[in-house]
Design a protein with these regions (language model features):
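Short Lys/Arg-rich cationic patches that frequently serve as NLS/NoLS or arginine-rich RNA/DNA-binding motifs
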Residues: 1-14
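Short acidic-hydrophobic surface loop/beta-edge motif
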Residues: 14-26
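Short N-terminal binding/cap micro-motifs at the start of the first secondary-structure element
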Residues: 29
Length: 120
């Protein structure tokens, strides 16, 4: 049996739920509400990686979560970013205030959607 025949009987995967968070400046960050088991294990393993400082380890964990969970980022007055490369690039370019807001949003999101994971 060919690949096409096998795929016909399969249902499409449902979209993961999403949650939107709005900053005081009006930016909207949309985060995915589902994470695979492999991603959860990868995130847990980050806690055991030797880093130069506690700050380095914290930054790695925040960036990892952002990369895996960010779906869309609407910045005031611009087209929304939806491509993974664009989202990560903009995160790396973010100001200290934007990073603080993102960290707080990730903590809130983890508490609501992934209470079993340790927030950075």
């Amino acid at each position: 049996m060919g690949k096409r025949s096998r795929r016909r009987g399969q249902e499409a995967m449902p979209d993961a739920p999403e949650a939107a968070y709005t900053s005081p400046e009006g930016d909207v960050l949309t985060l995915r509400g589902a994470m695979t088991i492999a991603t959860r294990q990868e995130y847990a393993a980050l806690g055991g990686i030797a880093a130069a400082t506690q700050e380095d380890a914290w930054q790695r964990r925040v960036e990892f979560l952002f990369e895996r969970l960010a779906v869309r980022w609407e910045l005031a007055g611009t087209e929304p970013l939806v491509k993974q490369k664009e989202l990560l690039g903009r995160y790396r370019f973010a100001s200290a205030d934007e990073r603080r807001w993102i960290r707080d949003v990730l903590r809130e999101h983890l508490a609501e959607w992934f209470p079993d994971l340790e927030a950075p």
